Amino acid sequence: MSTIRPVFYVSDGTGITAETIGHSLLTQFSGFTFVTERMVFIDDAEKARDASQRILAASQRYRVRPIVVNSCVNPYLSVILAESGALMLDVFAPFIGLLEHELNTSRHSRIGRAHGMVDFETYHRRINAMNFALAHDDGVAASYDEAEVILVAVSRAGKTPTCIYLALHYGIRAANYPLIDEDLNSDQLPLRLRPYRKKLFGLTINPERLQQIRQERRPNSRYAALDTCKREVAAAERMFSAERITTLSTTHTSIEEISSKVLVTLGLQREMF
């Protein structure tokens, strides 16, 4: 069996739902190379037929059955896509019938509801959270009074992408603070962070992985040297331990998992947008 499998994320909207679920599923299987492609706004029969032909062409090119993660709400479009002969993983079909029976009502197909601008208040909260994350990135903010979360870590340990994810998907006002040499000379929290202890969450990372990331940013620099990475990570972990700050390693942890851990640890109840 070929270890290369073409995968298509097909949606009548942006494709975020299909890609998120598909990625979560595929990460459970090692030893394969998944060649992925997004097909978005497939919202009529003509577009569905074109998509089906492209999927069929991929099966001929790779000589293996493609995988389709489908989030189209119109079942007719799903039938057309299935004509490609691909393995169809329908995001909604297994659950719609169960919900219709339980709620004693028929569904109303609404394209893009999962990630669309459902109402202005929700959209406004998301944008404000995003602006907050950018304004409070890398310790540039004068105050953290309005922050709901403050991620603390050495440089390039995953603070910024996690803050942005929390803002976009949960509307969380997330700030981050980079630990610099001056901070790492002590096992105590930096003075700026001490008033916000209950908002802090520490991120750590394998030094070898940190070196790889820093090497891409500043090749062959002292900043990217392995001994620098080891020293900074060890000092940060000593501080987190001494101050009893909950920590999580980002080395083999997805942003989704990190974000979920942060929300649970800090007791933030927020629905995903």
From Swiss-Prot:
Known EC number: 2.7.11.33, 2.7.4.28
Enzyme class, first EC level, given as a word: transferase
Annotated binding of ADP, by residue: 153-160
GO molecular function, one term: phosphotransferase activity, phosphate group as acceptor
Superkingdom of the source species: Bacteria
Function text: Bifunctional serine/threonine kinase and phosphorylase involved in the regulation of the phosphoenolpyruvate synthase (PEPS) by catalyzing its phosphorylation/dephosphorylation.
Family (UniProt): Belongs to the pyruvate, phosphate/water dikinase regulatory protein family. PSRP subfamily.
Protein known as: Putative phosphoenolpyruvate synthase regulatory protein
Lineage: Bacteria, Pseudomonadati, Pseudomonadota, Gammaproteobacteria, Lysobacterales
